[in-house]
């Protein structure tokens, strides 16, 4: 360890000039620049805020901020009586406070006229956050309105009040300084901190990327930290400047000898315990500001912590890693080991992270960051994300080889493992830098006055709320008192829906269609109509009074939860002083972003003119990345703004505002719709914030006539289309200007504007939010390989390559330019042609074409995934019982996506000829690795019917034959269902396997129908023979004997019938057992005839048991006999059903035994003799199935010449 450089030494080596300057500043106590990375609060006793980060040269620094006032505000008239009353309330609750101050602020909810604009507040100061929180809770429960009432993260309030961002350069002034080892410690007061307004110098914070390698002696399993024999045998670490991918130093800590390398320092440890301690020691020497790994919050950190616990060294490890605070084990586990932190990936998805958060080092899981950047990514592996970015891939080293190298302790091979491990760490930093993750998050923190930790681990709405409060509390925005606590009744319901014009479905090949969109509709509406909580008027009388005084009001009304919600917002009429908080903030963000985008454009132009080898290229590239990060952060806040305004958990939530924005969106889209229609334009589709418009036919008259008068070649037609696109662009530019002027006249502002992005021609609308076409942006471009696609299922997450390919083929074929004089195939013809080729020529598809992905969410009712995971769990348990590896059936982490295919199962039928093999998706799913390993056949028909046909039906459901009657409400759903049914019949007509399966079902049904008729006939005769016994109550025994004799005589007379029936059953059973056709190389199921007969046999036993039950109920005199018979029949049926008679054949001993019972009770005269043989048979059966010889002898002895067979039983 001594030979490895620590952080200070590395900084001095890399930045000697800056280090000398920083040293001089420290010696003279001159102002210093400090970049905060991590924040920690001391909440007990006097409140203290600690910020950790680096100085300008890269030195590790701790800034301790003391004398921070702890307070909150309460709205109350500040006269002596009220102050005394407030004091008495606090005193009565034993709440210790320091002092009270009076101030005036504007309440955030409700409009107040000029003379009543500000309300009195009392600011209460405390010695600790504990007393502050007690007082806030008490006064809120008493009904008082509070403000500046942060109770969880008080540092956010400090940042807002001081206007001191926690993620950018801060200048330290008048500090006290104490060097301690690698850490430079500063103590300041809030007044000694100054926000550095310029971009500042290059940040020299240090990132440590790491990776661990683990081993398990149980092959094929994922190493589990809870298993004593599973170990971490290697940890590789590499450090970088935060903005660079060039490593500053690298270390490999290993338990197996490893050949030395010039790329890293190797530390050999004798045990896992020593390896973990060495990791902590090296961590402390480098003192990183950020620690990152790939999926380390799901695997690496839990493994390290659990193993440290097992070795009893977690406290020692934490205190080595933490340069600042030493803690006891219980405090570490409670406060610093974050076991379950829910990280939001997208609106629908979150992921659980676990990590050890040592003060001064911020943990970042690169996988989580990449998943947030690519929320719809089907693969979330390190290799997949590297491929998406075009970065160098990771090293390919299978786990079984890695474990083999570890077991053999081959130093040469272990060097390969070390290289694999250290490159994984390198790629984490590559991804962070490529995606500009840290600068992007920092800019969000600067705008929202939150920490870097907040920007990584909290959702966007939380940061918008904090930003609003930061704007509101300052004088230039009106000194508005804001609470962080949501109040009022939390209602759930739907706001007014968007204005939608149903699409004109079908393929448009004659006229271009242009999209006209509102630019940032909801933020624009907020700015235009002054939607802000402090501009809201709830009372109609107050609204009338304000209008009488000359105020302009915007009225909103909508229905919510079966009641009318209405209100008014005071308009600003373009007067800055009248603008509300929301419009002011949005306008400020918009102006900042506009300026940044202009600067970004200039920097981009410079980058194109300078070669990468130029000395100033890196600086220019860095500046471009920083400006881009700032404008992205502004965009995020503007887009998230309405979401927070409509969030009923937000302290800013106001129902009339949330619904008023959406209802105003409706109004304005209708306004534009009517304007465009009245101008003679056509509407193809409209939804929420956009209209798809076609120009009047007269616009194209001249170019169309020119084409008609030409030779009408394909070249002439292409020229016609080219000119139509140009004319549409010009017309839309004019129309767009007219629409914006019309909107300006209507709402009195220029904030609400529309713009057109592209002309689509040809274009096809298949449903709401579903369309595709060729997009022409600046110039005409008829490339069918670059389609503009919205909402079509081929871009849906988890979709197979098969569906994407078929859908793409249909769209590309339909987009080809075809002259009116040529045959223009209707879309249904194109779909059928592509579909037929896909179904008939199945050899064109590869295994990879059928791979799907889905997410495992245990709390979501995804039946297919739930069934599949249940099957995989059963497989794992079964394999574990036999001591076999089960990792190939491992369950993904909740929220994680997994890959699978649908495989073909054996076709089976029940007694009536109905399919009994499961058609449920969950029963057919298999992991990709398992399907590949066992070469399982793909169920192509399942993919066609369940995925492809739905997509294809979407293209053709506008056809007249699929349209619903007038009384159907959901016409699109009806047409889609009919179109899919049509295509299913089309596939059945061309798919050979489907035909063969249908034929098998027909054969089974015919066989069953014939046999069932015979069974019914013979059971009816049987019942008639015993009719006299059923009706005779005086002498039941004699009647039973007589009926039994009739039955024997009848049975002897039926031999010819039985023989005929036997042949028929044999014939049909043989037909049913013939193998069916096997299309596309996939074996079809072919159930044997004995399976059919087995089912019929069970049904017969059930029917005869009913008759025996009737006999039992009728004759007490033969109670013992029939009880014996019934019990044994029940026993045999139960045995048959539970054991399923795997060795069962028509002539098997089991059938003979059941037959013996049947014949014996019919021959009542010999029943008392047969009892002993039946008992002997049953005793024998309990041990092993009786031999055929034994049964045959017993039957011949007791029943004479009756020769049993399985077919006799049918009679």
From Swiss-Prot:
The residue range of the signal peptide is none
- Recorded E.C. number(s)? 2.7.7.7
sequence repeat boundaries? 1074-1077, 1078-1081, 1082-1085, 1086-1089
Pfam families tied to this protein: DNA_pol_B (PF00136), DNA_pol_B_exo1 (PF03104)
Is-annotated flag, keyword DNA-binding?
A: yes
Induction trigger: Expressed in the early phase of the viral replicative cycle.
In terms of Gene3D superfamilies, this protein maps to:
DNA polymerase family B, C-terminal domain, Helix hairpin bin, Palm domain of DNA polymerase, Ribonuclease H-like superfamily/Ribonuclease H
Q: What class of enzyme is it?
A: transferase
The entry's function note states: DNA-directed DNA polymerase involved in viral DNA replication.
Name the UniProt record assigns to this protein: DNA polymerase beta
